[in-house]
């Protein structure tokens, strides 16, 4: 059993930052605690809510009749609460309480349609929308007029991959991307192939980086667009954006980058890096879901066919009424990303180093990514645990929220195509787990995760015949396996 104390105060205090929290969040915490499989009591004098929740301790019986028991790591619930520890920030981030506070006023007082130009309700909302647009542009040194609001990075990637080639299709019929892009980029590229475009998929090396010479060789006279992800969502590898942008500019080719995992987390200057289009997602930077943006360069101008038409909003590139609460939250999240970038960077690097060292101290583990810190985002740590299935490990880690790859493909049983592109075999690709560290991750949580992973990897390997053979000194590569 472990006990959690949730104080009914107007603030939540982490060991590294003080956050304002609205009463809405307090009620949410209390509701979450009361609906979990736990025992809840309250103390009227101290204003404390006590929640006791059991931890499962699975036990299995191998064929020889012996018993293997999994001893749960000790969890200090006064720090962690009753829900699993969250280490899946590449899938989504929690909304920063200050972002929520900013959004709430747009559900009550500032409810005007920002496109209504005949009265004060529309004017005041439009003013706030433009303020948010400015905050978002400022992070990447762009002009606010170059920010086009969308529903998220998937729509933005579709807009770039489909919109630019369609506009120039009479003279340009070739697109270049990489084998490790997000699914929405790869699927959009395949869609354009069906429309008659040629697609070149650049390979990556064992650390996930493209070869710039491969890019130069792939360029043709009719190449219209190069799309390369800034930070990979599965392994955290940072591509050399400045060098890619320079190559594209010299060849008069448009350069698009999916920066959903990079925006606000690594330095990006669209002018210095010669980026023409850039995809942004709000919910990756502690903002609300359902809102994103596309940076579209104005000088030299980038032309594209819109994929959503109608009222002509957003410079005619993305029609539809904007959602002011989401836009305001997005803008506030962007402002905070720039304001706290130095602190976030230091905090994430510290915890990432600790987590990575702790995980790689386990025998037969492998880090998936780039060992050069210049090309590796520290908040994404992808590790393969040999001789066990990643899905089995996830099931044994019910008290930690993790994933075995992209959230968009996590339901698939197929091994990661990203790790395959790096040259990993099926076994290592199947045994990979992605750990995400963010602004609200604490050192105590990382300590617990390292201890829990050590225990449960050991537990699962004791049931693995392959692990038993390796421990017995058998070289698995020397065995001639036969199928029946």
UniProtKB/Swiss-Prot annotation:
rRNA processing in keyword set: no
Mutation effect (residue 374 to A): In strain: CHAU1
Keyword terms of this UniProt record: Iron, Iron-sulfur, Metal-binding, Mitochondrion, Pyridoxal phosphate, Transferase, Transit peptide, tRNA processing
Ligand binding ([2Fe-2S] cluster): 408
Active site as annotated: 408 (cysteine persulfide intermediate)
Gene3D superfamilies associated with the record: Aspartate Aminotransferase, domain 1, Type I PLP-dependent aspartate aminotransferase-like (Major domain)
GO molecular function, one term: cysteine desulfurase activity
Compositionally biased residues, Low complexity: 29-42
N6-(pyridoxal phosphate)lysine found at: 284
SUPFAM superfamilies from the UniProt entry: PLP-dependent transferases
Region (Disordered): 29-69
Reaction(s) catalysed by this chain's protein: (sulfur carrier)-H + L-cysteine = (sulfur carrier)-SH + L-alanine
Cofactor(s) the protein needs: pyridoxal 5'-phosphate
Keyword tRNA processing: yes
Protein name per Swiss-Prot or TrEMBL: Cysteine desulfurase, mitochondrial
């Amino acid at each position: 059993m472990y006990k959690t104390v949730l104080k009914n105060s107007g603030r939540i205090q982490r060991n590294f930052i003080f956050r304002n929290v609205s009463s809405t969040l307090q009620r949410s915490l209390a509701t979450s605690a009361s609906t979990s499989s736990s025992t809840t009591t309250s103390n009227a004098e101290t204003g404390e809510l006590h929640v006791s929740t059991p931890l499962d301790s699975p036990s299995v019986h191998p064929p020889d009749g012996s018993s293997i028991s999994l001893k749960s790591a000790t969890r200090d619930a006064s720090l962690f609460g009753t829900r699993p520890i969250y280490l899946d920030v590449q899938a989504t981030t929690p909304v920063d309480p200050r972002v929520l506070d900013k959004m709430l006023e747009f559900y009550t007082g500032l409810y005007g349609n920002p496109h209504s130009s005949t009265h004060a309700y529309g004017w005041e909302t439009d003013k706030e929308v433009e303020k948010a647009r400015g905050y978002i542009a400022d992070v990447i040194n762009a002009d606010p007029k170059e920010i086009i609001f969308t529903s998220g990075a998937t729509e933005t990637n579709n807009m770039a991959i489909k919109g630019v080639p369609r506009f120039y299709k009479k003279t340009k019929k070739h697109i270049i991307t990489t084998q490790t892009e997000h699914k929405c980029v790869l699927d959009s590229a395949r869609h354009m192939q069906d429309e008659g475009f040629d697609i070149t998929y650049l390979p990556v090396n064992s650390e996930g980086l493209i070869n710039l010479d491969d890019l130069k060789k792939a360029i043709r006279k009719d190449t219209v667009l190069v799309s390369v992800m800034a930070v990979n969502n599965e392994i955290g590898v940072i591509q050399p954006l400045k060098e890619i942008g320079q190559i594209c500019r010299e060849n008069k080719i448009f350069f698009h980058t999916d920066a959903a995992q990079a925006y606000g987390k690594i330095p990006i200057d669209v002018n210095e890096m010669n980026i023409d289009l850039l995809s942004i997602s709000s919910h990756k930077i502690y903002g609300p879901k359902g809102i994103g943006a596309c940076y579209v360069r104005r000088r030299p101008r980038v032309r594209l066919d819109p994929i959503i038409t109608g009222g002509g909003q957003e410079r005619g590139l993305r029609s539809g009424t904007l959602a002011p609460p989401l836009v305001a939250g997005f803008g506030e999240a962007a402002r905070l990303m720039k304001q706290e970038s130095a602190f976030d960077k230091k905090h994430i690097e510290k915890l990432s180093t600790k987590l990575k060292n702790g995980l790689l101290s386990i025998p037969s583990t492998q880090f998936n990514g780039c060992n050069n810190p210049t090309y590796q985002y520290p908040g994404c740590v992808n590790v393969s645990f040999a001789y066990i299935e990643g899905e089995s490990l996830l099931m044994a880690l019910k008290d930690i929220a993790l994933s075995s790859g992209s959230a968009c493909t996590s339901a698939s049983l197929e091994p990661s195509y990203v790790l395959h592109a790096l040259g990993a075999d099926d076994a290592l690709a199947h045994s990979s787990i992605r750990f995400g560290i963010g602004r609200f991750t604490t050192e105590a949580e990382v300590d617990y995760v390292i201890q829990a992973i050590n225990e449960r990897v050991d537990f699962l390997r004791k049931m693995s015949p392959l692990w038993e053979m390796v421990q017995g000194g058998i070289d698995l590569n020397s065995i001639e396996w036969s199928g029946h």
